[in-house]
Regions:
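Short, contiguous, well-structured surface segments enriched in hydrophobic/aromatic residues
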Residues: 1-29, 33
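Acidic, Ser/Thr/Gly/Pro-rich intrinsically disordered interaction regions
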Residues: 26-189
Length: 189
């Protein structure tokens, strides 16, 4: 349940924030989330599974101990299909699933899309983040404060410190690509 509720809350609040930012941003993000819903069965399954849990039943029907300290939970397809509020598309998705549904692979398939939504929101606020940095720098100058820098250390002795500017332009270019392909798997290194 926590994953379903967190996913739904994240998407809802992201749309609320985009709406506050402006109509174009909200429309872009709404289009993106609609496209993900239309094209990714795992995403729509979890979006509707939250409603199932809140309004109908706990979804797990089988528990298997596979190691002394590890268990696996499975949803039973026939139990899920007893719920009548899945909607036609998600109901068909569930009908195509195995009788015992291990949701872990479904979760893994949803994460790249959630990251895309997050990065799109970051893109909308990137200029604000940069402006905040300038405002902070101006305050530090005004009050004669030492200007902070973000540094990385190569060793524990505080030697070889490296100042790395944040590559905002490259990040913005990458996020811009998400408008056209929200299913890119972006791995952070």
């Amino acid at each position: 349940f926590n994953f379903c509720a967190s996913m739904r809350t994240f998407v809802d609040y992201t749309l609320i924030a985009a709406n506050r930012k402006g109509n174009a941003e909200h429309d872009d993000l709404k289009t993106m989330t609609s496209q993900i819903f239309d094209e990714l069965p795992e995403y729509r399954f979890f979006e509707k599974l939250r409603n199932y849990i809140i309004h109908y039943s706990y979804p797990f029907g089988t528990l298997r101990k596979i190691a002394p300290d590890r268990v696996e939970f499975f949803c039973m397809k026939n139990h899920l299909l007893e719920y009548d509020a899945w909607g036609a598309i998600v109901k068909k998705d569930i009908e195509l699933m195995p009788e015992e549904i291990d949701i872990r692979p479904y979760i893994r398939k949803v994460f790249p899309s959630l990251e895309s939504i997050y990065l799109m929101m970051y893109y909308y606020y990137a200029e604000d983040y940069c402006n905040a940095n300038s405002i902070l720098a101006n305050l530090q100058k005004k009050y004669n404060l030492e200007y902070p820098v973000i540094m990385s250390e190569n060793n524990a002795d505080n030697k070889n410190k490296i100042i790395r500017p944040f590559p905002v332009k490259k990040i913005v270019e990458g996020i811009e690509m998400l408008k056209y392909n929200p299913f890119l798997d972006i791995s952070f290194v």
